[in-house]
Amino acid sequence: MGRRGTRDTGPDGAGEPEGVPGTELLADADRSDSWFLVVEGTPQSHVDLSDPSYLDFSYMRRIAHAADLVAPAGEPIDALHLGAGALTLARYVAHTRPGSRQRAVDVDAPLVEMVRRRLPWDRRAQLRVGIGDAREWIGARHADSADLVVSDVFAGARTPARLTSVEFYGEMARVLRPGGLLAVNIGDGHSLEHTRAQAATARAVLPHVALTAAPAILRGRRFGNLVLVAGHRPLPSEDLGRRAHRDPEMARLLEGGDLDRFVSGRAPVHDADAVDSPAPPDDVF
């Protein structure tokens, strides 16, 4: 998590929300009106209800870099979010790009209702949240309908296998507009075999792919989050790299030859051979 949370206070009381077993809302001890959402022991989201532009988790800032660069600053966009959590990025987009049309989906109905009730978002936001399977939901969306697609889906601390394949990436690419960006959150560590295969998978579907993460994670020295950014057209790589370098947790951007060497001949993943993302070590959180 990186910083402290406490169960002492919260919106309507902190701790385990009624009717949502395994889920905790923890007040941020260092920041007022801010909360950590923890699911099955895994810190899933952080939200600042007073300032949605504040992003505590470094991987979320890396996804936000893509959201910032997909269109001119302040211009409304159409965004799809696979995995709702506490809707941190959707709140960010609504705040930084007023008038954006956003849809999000999550399979966990009690969690979505708890977030709606306990961590309400700005009513002016054009944000609709549905309940359902991310892959089925994205398959029902119209082609060329989104400027930004974010895949941040975890069952506990692992991404389900069916959300890691060429077939799934193909559905996300189908709904992405020509100038749009796809951002995928990946949890991995040590050999980074899962991430290498995911980069190969994204490349099998979209011609332009980059990967960003902290150097220690890219070297396999610790388990953490890596973010894939992909699109039909060349990426805003210079700006992405500059923002990654200037982030409070500095990151590197891999693309082109650097990404070739990282992937190092790994084959794309298909439904028939897909597996869940690796589980983090017990002491990560």
Language-model features and meaning:
Residues L163, D188-T195, T201, P268-D283:
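Alpha-helical subdomain
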Residues G179-I186:
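Conserved beta-strand signature within the Rossmann-like core of class I S-adenosyl-L-methionine
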Residues Y169-G170, H194-P215:
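Conserved Class I S-adenosyl-L-methionine
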Residues A155-G156, G187-S191, A216-L218:
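Short "lid" loop at the C-terminus of a central beta-strand within the Rossmann-like core
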Residues G2-A29, Q44-S50, R219-F285:
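SAM/dcSAM-binding transferase cores
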Residues E16-E18, R31, S50-R174, P178, ...:
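The AdoMet/dcAdoMet-binding core of the Class I SAM-like
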Residues V38-H46, V149, L181:
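Short, basic/glycine-rich phosphate-binding loops at helix/coil junctions
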Residues D30-V39:
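N-terminal glycine-rich anion-binding loops that anchor highly charged ligand groups
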